[in-house]
């Protein structure tokens, strides 16, 4: 991937492929992921850089993930607001899990995005378990994409194991946003084989 020049993404800690899609190198992604010397992430022990599973690459628009997952939605909504206010042609992507979609921060972010028509998509990855809570005990909605209805913007569900669906969905969301359509939510149905981390 060459990514999209100027666009910004906020991945979750396991979203290594998103950095590659935006144009980061395999070496940089692995150095950051493993906390090795040469990482483009600051910190670590003895300037080793990075932290396990926390990758980011500012030079290609990939923000470092945050451990509290809902924060990405707020950060990216703020950056989308700045882009909208400055009339920049820039698209923002905030990745969160289904558990994070029950947080107040996420709802506040979506409310602002919907009210202002901000150029952002929220990728809600439903891996069937938030820390240790099953989806049926987290929310009253049966289809997680329905959460966007309350904020007045479109959403759809894709199969998380289908790379073509990922590409087509994010490309559609980007085109929609940059043509003035506003925010979207992409609900990704996937499965994690075990509990947290």
Regions found by a protein language model. Name each.
Residues 105-106, 125, 195:
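Short, function-defining helix-loop hinge/capping sites that tune catalysis or transport
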Residues 17, 128-131, 192-194:
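Short gly/pro/ser/thr-enriched loop/turn and capping motifs at secondary-structure boundaries
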Residues 115-116, 125-183:
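Ligand/cofactor pocket segment of small-molecule handling proteins
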Residues 1-116, 134-140, 145-152:
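Cofactor-binding active-site loop characterized by glycine-rich and histidine/acidic residues
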Residues 29, 176-197:
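Glycine/aspartate-rich loop-and-adjacent alpha/beta segment that forms the canonical ThDP
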Residues 10, 121-123, 157, 185-187:
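Structured core elements
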Residues 101, 161-165, 192:
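Acidic, metal-coordinating catalytic cores used for nucleic-acid/nucleotide bond scission
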């Amino acid at each position: 991937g060459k990514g999209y020049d100027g666009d910004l993404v906020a991945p979750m800690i396991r979203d290594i492929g998103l950095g590659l899609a935006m144009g980061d190198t395999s070496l940089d992604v692995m150095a950051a992921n493993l906390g090795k010397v040469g990482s483009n992430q600051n910190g670590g022990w003895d300037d080793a850089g990075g932290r396990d599973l926390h990758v980011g690459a500012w030079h290609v628009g990939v923000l470092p993930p945050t451990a509290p997952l809902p924060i990405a939605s707020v950060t990216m909504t703020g950056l989308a607001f700045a882009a909208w206010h400055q009339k920049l042609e820039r698209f923002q992507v905030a990745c969160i899990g289904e558990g994070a979609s029950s947080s107040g921060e996420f709802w506040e972010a979506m409310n602002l995005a919907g009210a202002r028509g901000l150029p952002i998509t929220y990728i809600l990855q439903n891996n069937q378990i938030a820390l240790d809570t099953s989806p049926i005990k987290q929310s009253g909605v049966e289809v997680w994409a329905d959460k966007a209805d309350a904020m007045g913007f479109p959403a759809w569900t894709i199969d998380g194991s289908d790379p073509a669906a990922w590409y087509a969905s994010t490309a559609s969301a980007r085109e929609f946003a940059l043509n003035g359509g506003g925010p979207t939510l992409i609900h990704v149905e996937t499965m994690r084989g075990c509990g947290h981390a």
